[in-house]
Amino acid sequence: MGRHILLAFLSILALAAPASAKTAAKGPPRGDWTHVVASTPAGGFVLGNPNAKVKLVEYGSLTCPHCRAFDQEGVPTLLGKYVRPGQVSWEFRNYVRDAADLTAALIARCNGARSFFPLTRALYKDQPVWFGKAAGTPKEQLEKLADLPPQRQFVAMAKLAGLDAWAAAHGLPAAKSNQCLANVKSVDQLVHMNHDATEQHPDFAGTPTFLINGALVKDVASWGSLEPKLKAALGG
């Protein structure tokens, strides 16, 4: 990842002071589709029935307060009422807004599909703590990160935000999390996912953004406004 890209993320941070083609579909364990998760060709992770009538995609940022509100207010109902019985599948695609967001995304994705959703939800729960630390870091200290080798930039960002200790407390030993944070290919993938989102969806207006069966849903950023759209797509 180039210096100019990291600096762009740092400037934003300062302002903030079906299953995958790679994975064969299987029936749900114990009749619960929330136990079925896979990676997707778009770089996201999908939870639920790959043959669900309604396929929901969320573009989310881990430092976005509206995304956190959706996670807390809407995801429990989304999972329990719609994903579990197989009516809706839910794909989450990271859309990174800043350096802290990218760091958190690398940690959430570190163990692949099996732990992505639990880690993502835990990061949202604790967002005020770790993002608060990142946003409170002096600008001069953040800018020094860009002078580090690419393999060390996000390891250092994790320490500033307390995400190194957070990862260890959530089952990712330092050796594992540091390996993921130093993976330049994973960083490049997240950057390309941002590009793909805006390239494929000209009306993309920030996070959270939702697609229902491939179509962008305009003017929807909360569970209260999304659920009626899901019901309509289900024919209810």
Question: Which residues fall in each region the model found?
Answer:
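Extracytoplasmic thiol/disulfide redox context detector
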Residues: G2-L102, V191-Q200, G235-G236
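Alpha-helical elements of the RecA-like P-loop NTPase motor core of helicases
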Residues: P65, D188, P228
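Cysteine-centric redox/oxidoreductase cores and disulfide-bonded domains
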Residues: V96-G206, L211-A215, V220-G224, A232-G235
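Solvent-exposed, non-membrane alpha-helical residues enriched in polar/charged side chains
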Residues: L79-G80, E227, K231
